[in-house]
């Protein structure tokens, strides 16, 4: 957990959260490379003994306060060895503090090289820094998991900061106007309304910007989840803060071919993030089962259409993450996973009447967000405006192995591996070439190939992508 010292209860919460996962090393290093010529490097709080006490009290296993020579053995003039991505620092603090984030990525890369941690814990208060360091870890392929922790605030909403101790009493009273202005921003014109509120409170505005939380590029009201961030000067103290603006709750779309493990990981991901799980595959399987039960030819759309008129299809979550599927009051949870249903579901799902009926139902269920759906065309046809789109896939051989294991566990006969591979390849062909809503990766979807990945690793990857778009403060992880 990298810090510059001057620890407070915001750092304490980081330490407490991190200590639940394993031993915690807190570093204290006032990095000269991230201060501009006229900034507060010389007066930045240096309270090492108090920092040690707070870190120990909150559960840290060790505190490390390296010297400048230890971090930059070649000396400061040649120390800046990395640059933050230009696109991530053209707005917000990056625009007004040139070189700041280059200094941040340089020191954090050095710390990670020296410590080799499994996890990097950071506060969400400086969201731009969090985004940039997430990119650093990916670009360097360090295999480090980046965890963000929500901003800790005073009772009046002011975000805890080491620099808050600079505030004189009168300034401290005015500083509370920053979180209040962000919290009460006018949805029709949030930037202007915040600027007006801050100016009225006597705060000097450095910037107020609305950006995409992941790209940090300006965005407008058409973006369902955006970041409204501001920096001000209150007296001689610089303060930053942000809020998430959400026109609806988060919406996640997970697509991919048959046997890629979508249902398993999506269900677990939904439970971990507190999202409703929508298994669209189960919906199409349910209609296929109904077609077979009524003796209707699965190729005959005209005969299938009347079955949809009075269809009562319900998906119910069960304790422990399971799901019950009811068709016209009958529990078909196991029946829809049979080889017979599997063999015909692609053909049934290709009928326009079926897709239109189920897509309309799915859109209605996701209108308010707070949902993760998996299927074949979620990110392209059902929820093209999803905040996160993932195309989950695996090789045919890997999917055949998983299918064999699933059939065995459900008590069905298991065909030869070559036969399963042929079935899966044929299913891929049918799904990707059908006229109505074919299986295709959305242009803005992240492809995740899961060969060799454990279920937990796939879920962690999904959580990481979700958190790069939606902060903990905006959508808290459920307790437990």
From Swiss-Prot:
UniProt: ATP binding residues: 4-11, 123-126, 152, 160-163
Binding-site list for beta-alanine: 34
Pantoate--beta-alanine ligase: annotated segments: 1-243
Localization (cell): Cytoplasm
Residues that hold (R)-pantoate according to the record: 34, 129
Enzyme Commission (EC) number: 6.3.2.1, 2.7.4.25
NCBIfam families: cmk, panC, PRK13477.1
Name this polypeptide is given: Bifunctional pantoate ligase/cytidylate kinase
Gene: panC/cmk
């Amino acid at each position: 957990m990298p810090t510059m010292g001057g620890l407070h209860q915001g750092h304490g919460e980081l330490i407490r959260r991190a200590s639940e996962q394993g031993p915690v090393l807190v570093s204290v290093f006032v990095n000269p490379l991230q201060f501009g010529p006229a900034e507060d490097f010389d007066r930045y709080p240096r309270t090492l003994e108090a920092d040690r006490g707070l870190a120990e009290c909150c559960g840290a296993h060790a505190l490390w306060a390296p010297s400048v020579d230890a971090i930059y053995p070649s000396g400061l003039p040649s120390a800046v060895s990395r640059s933050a991505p230009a696109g991530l620092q053209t707005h917000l603090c990056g625009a007004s503090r040139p070189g700041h984030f280059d200094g941040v990525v340089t020191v954090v890369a050095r710390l990670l090289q020296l410590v080799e941690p499994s996890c990097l814990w950071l506060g969400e208060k400086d969201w731009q820094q969090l985004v940039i360091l997430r990119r650093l870890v990916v670009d360097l392929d360090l295999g480090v998991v980046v965890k963000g922790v929500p901003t800790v605030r005073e009772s009046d909403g002011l975000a805890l900061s080491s620099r808050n101790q600079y505030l004189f009493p009168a300034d401290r009273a005015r500083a509370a106007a920053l979180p209040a202005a962000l919290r009460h921003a006018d949805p029709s014109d949030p930037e202007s309304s915040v600027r007006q509120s801050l100016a009225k409170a006597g705060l000097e505005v450095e910037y107020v910007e609305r950006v995409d939380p992941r790209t940090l590029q300006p965005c407008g009201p058409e973006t369902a989840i955006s970041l409204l961030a501001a920096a001000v000067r209150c007296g001689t103290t610089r303060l930053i803060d942000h809020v998430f603006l959400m026109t609806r709750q988060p919406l996640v779309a997970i697509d991919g071919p048959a046997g890629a493990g979508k249902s398993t990981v999506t269900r677990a991901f939904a439970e971990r993030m507190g999202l409703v799980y929508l298994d669209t595959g189960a919906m199409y399987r349910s209609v296929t089962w109904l077609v077979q039960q009524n003796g209707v030819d699965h190729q005959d759309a005209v005969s299938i259409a009347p079955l949809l008129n009075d269809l009562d299809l319900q998906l119910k979550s069960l304790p422990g993450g399971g799901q019950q599927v009811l068709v016209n009051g009958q529990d078909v949870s196991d029946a829809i996973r049979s080889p017979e249903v599997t063999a015909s579901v692609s053909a049934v799902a290709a009928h326009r009447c079926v897709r239109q009926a189920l897509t309309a139902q799915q859109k209605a269920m996701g209108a308010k967000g707070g949902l993760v759906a998996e299927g074949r065309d979620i990110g392209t046809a059902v929820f093209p405006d999803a905040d996160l789109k993932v195309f989950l896939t695996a090789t045919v051989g890997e999917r055949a192995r998983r299918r064999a294991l699933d059939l065995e566990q459900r008590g069905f006969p298991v065909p030869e591996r070559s036969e399963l591979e042929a079935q899966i390849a044929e299913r891929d062909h049918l799904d990707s070439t059908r006229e109505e809503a074919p299986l295709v990766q959305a242009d803005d979807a992240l492809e995740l190939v899961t060969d060799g990945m454990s279920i937990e690793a796939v879920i962690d990857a999904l959580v990481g992508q979700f958190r790069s778009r939606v902060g903990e403060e905006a959508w808290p992880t459920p307790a437990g």
